Amino acid sequence: MEVPSYFDPDYDPSSLRVVDLRNILTEYQIYYPSTAKKAQLITLFSKLRRAKNGLISMTELQQKNVPPSSRSPRRRVAGVTNNVTARISSKRKINMVDEANDTEISKTSQFEDNVMGMLQDENVQVLNTNTITISEESEFHASKIAKIDSRNEEITHIPFETQTELNAAVVNLDNSMESSFSIVQNLTNKDSSVDTATYDFSAEVGNIVTPASKFLDYDQSYLVNASVSGDPTPVKVLNTTSPKSENPLNQSSFLSFLGENLKPKFTSRSSSVYASPIKSSLNSLECNPSNLLSVRKNFQQSSDSYLKSNKSFDQLNNLVGLSTGNSENFTPENNSFSWTHPKKNSSSPLPQSQSSSIFVEHLNQLYEANASIHRPVNPAFSTNFGLEASNTSTPEKKKFDSQKPDDDSVNEISSDLGLSTTGIDRVEENISLTKDRQPKRPYFSLGSFISLIFSFTKVVNSLWLVLLVVPLLGFVGFWHQEVQRVGFCGVPAEPYPSSLYYLQPGVLRSSIESAYSFAHSLGIEASCQPCPENAECGFNRQLFCKEGLKASFPLLADFGLKPYPRCIPNTVKVNKVEEMVQAFMSIIGKWYYKAPKEFATFESAKNLNGKSFVDNFKDRYYMYKQDIDNVVGLKDFKVYLKTTLNRLYNSKLTRKVLYYLFSPLFTLELWKLRVRGALSKFPTNCLRSVYSHTVSLMKYLTSAVISCWRIYLLIGILAAITGTVVWRIRVYAKKHVVKHGVSVCVSHCIAKLQKTKLKSLTDFSVNPRVEVVQLRSDCFVSGVADDKGLFELVHLPLSIQLEIWEKVVSVLEGMVSVKVWDSERLAKNRAWEWIGVFSDDIAL
């Protein structure tokens, strides 16, 4: 026999995977702990390689690495193949009889010894370990029970060629669970003259080693092998009804042990990520009881065809009374199994122990759950949201525990997917990423639907802006305008009006600033103009004219807001800036001609006479007339200018004020200094104006709101109704999109897991595990060009993608056919592997 390459001294053992190291050590009967890490396995492999190269003795190595004597003889090694990449199935923790007395445990141990003696054969390799012996002392009894509970059973991978036969055998046992009791009853009632140990079961079992499925213990696997063998030779067992029976195994103790070990064990952890590709149908039945009748109906045809082709199996059925009709002997009403002798019509109920009562109660729950289903459920998609699939904690599970999908939504998603975990559905429903796959429903343009929804949302938001934001902006604009207008008077520390900052051209602005600043420096403070005889003062210190009132903003006036402009007496008509300037010049002329000597004392006015001064100013004005008409056409400024002229006219310091008013026209240096000083004080003046008049403005706004509260109430009601409708539309659209996205992403993930698993069975270099990060990237980052659904998921908003992935993880973790935990990797880099049953028409 050719020595494999990994036994070469130059071969690096660290390149082997953990599962390969385990298989190699198991093949050469080198014991290793079930919790052994890769470093420990490499050490044992190095010793094995030295033994293969003749450096040490293989016998001594095997003797030094044998299982501890306290382990159960049920820990066995099946027929080992040369396939080093064979998958080791998950370990199952065995739950023994709770609170058993010494007599029952002793009988159980004797029963195990008898069964193990029947299974000795050259084709079934059993580790040489001592049987469990439990003394009658209570202390020793308690220690033995603790050791039995702490065991973990190692079961090797079964060859894939025996999948069909074993599926039929296991499902046959599942369809007629009470047939196991019929077998035992028939065996125990046979003639006691023949010794049980003389019967050779190995000749009937052959090389087939039934893998222990998720809920089958060693003794149950033995019963399956016995039913598959189908030997027509009568089996002679001891008659337990005789009081002098040589074999202490009796009917009551056997049913007690069998009932306890037939209970489903809801295990949730596994020490190995690899498991047998053949799964018992008990997995899907236990997780979804509604599948019980459908699975029985579908597999009954395959069982009948197998019985017709195998005569020995049929003869064994005739011998022990095993038939498909025996399932009718169990009824939930009487809570007992009735065994009918093949040659007699009378039936007698079997005695029940505490363990068998629990088993019967569990079956009652399955029947009740099946009877309570009022609508058909797709048996091809099994989830266990009612049970915890795993007690391991992962980051994504912690993050999304509060957002798990409900059972109804999961059932709707599962019915659309058509996934297969029982090996009955079509392969087209399992492999979804193929070009010739025909969708069950017409293609739905997810992108266009989302675009339509968001476009409609934008229109509604625009209406919302018009109904609410525009009136709010109107309030703000009106308040700002009121602050500016009222700030023209009543601000004692204001050197010049803040609105002059926007006045153009600069020469005219600087002239007025200079005059106002000079007056302030001389102690002349701005004050409100007294109300004329034909006007009345408003509550916000603005002047209301009795005649000719016009609103500045028609839109706000319709809502009750009427910010009237500042009025002047009717005797003064000011319509244009030019008329204002003409009136200004006439006043200047009067002042100049009235006291020319005093005015001429100023250095800048020495060479000026009255006429030349006025003409010079007019020339300067008409140079900027067009700009003034276009920019400075505000009524507020006109009122302010007229008020300023009146104040200057009544001032005793008229001549000095006029000098500072017109000096920038001749001295530009002084103009620059004045403007800089005025601009530096502008922020302070604005704040003072706001603080001074905020109270009066708020009172005015409050009265305006009270006068038109019905209109704003109507706007609020319309806005609430519109917002509610938009919110409901968005919720419905998001729910539909999330459901569709979960269906597409789950189908892609399952198909990729199945393809990778199938490829790894033929190509040992392919890792059957697919990282979760890669699956998420396929759905939401890269997408698949052939799949339109995945291509649309890439363009969804990030929040919707996150919600879809949360539900995808919940669905995949709930499936019994997906391995969620990888103990050799960190939680953030975990991987999934398909360990379910493939359809019969999938070619390996």
Curated annotation (Swiss-Prot):
Residues 395-407 have a biased composition (Basic and acidic residues). Residues 333-354, 384-415 are annotated as: Disordered. Its main location: endoplasmic reticulum. Pfam families: HeH, MSC. One of its GO terms (cellular component) is heterochromatin. The chain crosses the membrane at residues 459-479, 705-725. Residues 384-394 have a biased composition (Polar residues). One of its GO terms (molecular function) is heterochromatin-nuclear membrane anchor activity. It is found in: Endoplasmic reticulum membrane; Nucleus membrane. It is a multi-pass membrane protein. ATP binds at A605, K606, N607, L608, N609, G610, K611, S612. GO terms for biological process: attachment of telomeric heterochromatin to nuclear envelope; chromosome segregation; meiotic cell cycle; nuclear membrane organization. Keywords: ATP-binding, Chromosome partition, Endoplasmic reticulum, Meiosis, Membrane, Nucleotide-binding, Nucleus, Transmembrane, Transmembrane helix. The keyword Nucleus applies. InterPro entries: HeH/LEM_domain, Heh2/Src1, Man1/Src1-like_C. Interacts with sad1. Required for correct meiotic chromosome segregation. This is Meiotically up-regulated gene 61 protein. It comes from Schizosaccharomyces pombe (strain 972 / ATCC 24843).
